[in-house]
Amino acid sequence: MKGKKYYSDYHVWIEPIHSQIVRLGLSSRMQEHLGNILHIDLPSLGASIKEGEELCVLESSKSAIEVLSPVSGEVIEVNIALEDDTHPINHSAESEGWFVVLQLSEDFDGERFSLDP
């Protein structure tokens, strides 16, 4: 499971770090669709995120969207560098452009997600 990326219907990738810890970010396909990301509003450290609810807000050259979370958990790490420089989202959405790390309330279930972007 570790090292694999799973993809949600919300255009968010999920990278399991441990059974209950995952890293989340925007799929490259969605980044290409949105165009140049100009600004991001990320959740605060310690925030409780619910599946299907707002994970972050992205403003691009084309539109502004709410990105929905594919899983529920507590934010234990935030890529705050993105708030000052969105370059990693635009050029490395599936690596350096990650959004947050969540502590899940239960073990990650990859069966619900796709391995294809």
UniProtKB/Swiss-Prot annotation:
<feature type="domain" description="Lipoyl-binding">
    <location>
        <begin position="21"/>
        <end position="103"/>
    </location>
</feature>
<dbReference type="Pfam" id="PF01597">
    <property type="entry name" value="GCV_H"/>
</dbReference>
<comment type="similarity">
    <text>Belongs to the GcvH family.</text>
</comment>
<dbReference type="GO" id="GO:0019464">
    <property type="term" value="P:glycine decarboxylation via glycine cleavage system"/>
</dbReference>
<dbReference type="InterPro" id="IPR011053">
    <property type="entry name" value="Single_hybrid_motif"/>
</dbReference>
<dbReference type="InterPro" id="IPR017514">
    <property type="entry name" value="GcvH_Chlamydia"/>
</dbReference>
<protein>
    <recommendedName>
        <fullName>Glycine cleavage system H-like protein</fullName>
    </recommendedName>
</protein>
<dbReference type="InterPro" id="IPR000089">
    <property type="entry name" value="Biotin_lipoyl"/>
</dbReference>
<dbReference type="GO" id="GO:0005960">
    <property type="term" value="C:glycine cleavage complex"/>
</dbReference>
<feature type="modified residue" description="N6-lipoyllysine">
    <location>
        <position position="62"/>
    </location>
</feature>
<dbReference type="GO" id="GO:0005829">
    <property type="term" value="C:cytosol"/>
</dbReference>
<dbReference type="InterPro" id="IPR002930">
    <property type="entry name" value="GCV_H"/>
</dbReference>
<dbReference type="InterPro" id="IPR033753">
    <property type="entry name" value="GCV_H/Fam206"/>
</dbReference>
<keyword id="KW-0450">Lipoyl</keyword>
<dbReference type="InterPro" id="IPR003016">
    <property type="entry name" value="2-oxoA_DH_lipoyl-BS"/>
</dbReference>
